[in-house]
């Protein structure tokens, strides 16, 4: 898991997300507390439970982006789910237990990649030997068995040197590779995904591992052989146990749109996709044991981060038991014009940088001036105020409209320099921004 300090985590998030310092600090502290807990003695470590977070803020201010960036920084099993995808146990739809199953699957993939990377050097050596065996077959005795030689032959050493220098990369050889497992597509009703995956695993394992001869260039064969040899060096049972440990000790679940499962007003009959889902989430957040195809997983120390816009519902509309299990509340602020200006220029891969790079592929040089950036930000803010406030997502709509003409004619504009200043933006957007009806449908 990540050993970054809260200050370092916030600094990394600052490269991609503008503002929202309170939210960044909260997730940074929560992530660092995962590391701190692992430094305690085992008895005390078991007693320290994660402080789950509820992020509250209008749409388009950075809640989901914080989750995306956190997943890359955490170096721990991480999954993001939409609360609206689930229904109460016993009804058609996904059960909340599938969150932990998906998290465990993600952990198995992560641990497998780490194990393969750890064994890569040894796998490269074994792959090299297999290719050399094809190029210079080893000597055999009278019974057809390969003789063990004390020292590699001079020819083998010469070919090894050429192989490492890349002189043989384009030479074609025929090698035996593990055949891909038999693919079986099984249709199952919603909520029975676990049974489907188990049946698919069973069919794939029928008949054992088969070899298939393939004719490939040496550089392509080397990549496949390294993967195959690295996979052989990994112990599947150890891998599963390591993955389960990683989920139990370091797992993070991000639940988006949690405000959409709040009960609104009085209603009769079962509320299977709202209050019912909240009741089913309770045991997961509090701590329970979930059965997965890799083994039993305890959720006591998994960190849950929930987020929602709460424009119609309020955090107090969540059932009291769930409110109590999300003790840290963070409010994200609506974005201003100056925030929009910073979003257009400061992030490492800002929208303007992306558009400039895309147009550069056609030989068109785009330059955004400070006045142009300011006018784009003002136009986006103005449309948000007069119609629906969708936060920073409005910048994508406005910029796409602004760049439409250039994008269409880019192949005919090769070699030209185009400056996007305040006058250019006003010429292309002012009429749309001023007309509220047009803004509502076009921007």
UniProtKB/Swiss-Prot annotation:
GO terms for molecular function: ATP binding; ATP hydrolysis activity; peptidase activity; proteasome-activating activity. Induction: By heat shock. GO terms for cellular component: HslUV protease complex. It comes from the Bacteria. It holds the Pfam family AAA_2. Coiled coil: none annotated. InterPro entries: AAA+_ATPase, ATP-dep_Clp_protease_ClpX, ATPase_AAA_core, Clp_ATPase_C, HslU, P-loop_NTPase. One of its GO terms (biological process) is proteolysis involved in protein catabolic process. ATP binds at residues 18, 60-65, 256, 321, 393. Belongs to the ClpX chaperone family. HslU subfamily. ATPase subunit of a proteasome-like degradation complex; this subunit has chaperone activity. The binding of ATP and its subsequent hydrolysis by HslU are essential for unfolding of protein substrates subsequently hydrolyzed by HslV. HslU recognizes the N-terminal part of its protein substrates and unfolds these before they are guided to HslV for hydrolysis. This is ATP-dependent protease ATPase subunit HslU.
């Amino acid at each position: 898991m990540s050993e970054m300090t809260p200050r370092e985590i916030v600094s990394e998030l600052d490269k991609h997300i503008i503002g929202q310092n309170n939210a960044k600090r909260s997730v940074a502290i929560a992530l660092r507390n995962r590391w701190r807990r692992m430094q305690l003695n085992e008895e005390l470590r078991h007693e320290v439970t994660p402080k789950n977070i509820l992020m509250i803020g209008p749409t388009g201010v950075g809640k989901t982006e914080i989750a995306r960036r956190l997943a890359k920084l955490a170096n721990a099993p991480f999954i993001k789910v939409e609360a609206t995808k689930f229904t109460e146990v016993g009804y058609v739809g996904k059960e909340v237990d599938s969150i932990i199953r998906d998290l465990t699957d993600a952990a198995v993939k992560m641990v497998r990649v780490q194990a393969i990377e750890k064994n890569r050097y040894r796998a490269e050596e074994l792959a090299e030997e297999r290719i050399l065996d094809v190029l210079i077959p080893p000597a055999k005795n009278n019974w057809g068995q390969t003789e063990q030689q004390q020292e590699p032959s001079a020819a083998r050493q010469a070919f090894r040197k050429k192989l490492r220098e890349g002189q043989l990369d384009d030479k074609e050889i025929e090698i035996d590779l593990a055949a891909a497992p038999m693919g079986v597509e099984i249709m199952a009703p919603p909520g029975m995904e676990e049974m489907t995956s188990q049946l698919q695993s069973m069919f794939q394992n029928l008949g054992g591992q088969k070899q298939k001869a393939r004719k490939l260039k040496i550089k392509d064969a080397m990549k496949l052989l390294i993967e195959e040899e690295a996979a052989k060096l990994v112990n599947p049972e150890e891998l599963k146990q390591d993955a389960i440990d990683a989920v139990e000790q370091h797992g993070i679940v991000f639940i988006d749109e949690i405000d959409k499962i709040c009960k609104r007003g009085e209603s009769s009959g079962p509320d299977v996709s709202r209050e019912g889902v909240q009741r089913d989430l309770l045991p997961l957040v509090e701590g329970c044991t979930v059965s997965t195809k890799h083994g039993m997983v305890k959720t006591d120390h998994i960190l849950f981060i929930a987020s929602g816009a709460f424009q119609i519902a309020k955090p107090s509309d969540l059932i009291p038991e769930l409110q109590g299990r999300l003790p840290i509340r963070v409010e994200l602020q609506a974005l201003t014009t100056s925030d929009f200006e910073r979003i257009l220029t400061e992030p490492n891969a800002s929208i303007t940088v992306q558009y400039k790079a895309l147009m550069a592929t056609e030989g068109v040089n785009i330059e955004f001036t400070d006045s142009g950036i300011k006018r784009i930000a003002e136009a986006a803010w103005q449309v948000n105020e007069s119609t629906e406030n969708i936060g920073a997502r409005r910048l994508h709509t406005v910029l796409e409209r602004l760049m439409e003409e250039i994008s269409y004619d880019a192949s005919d504009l090769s070699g030209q320099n185009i400056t996007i200043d305040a006058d250019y933006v006003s010429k292309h957007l002012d009429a749309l921004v001023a007309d509220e009806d047009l803004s509502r449908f076009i921007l």
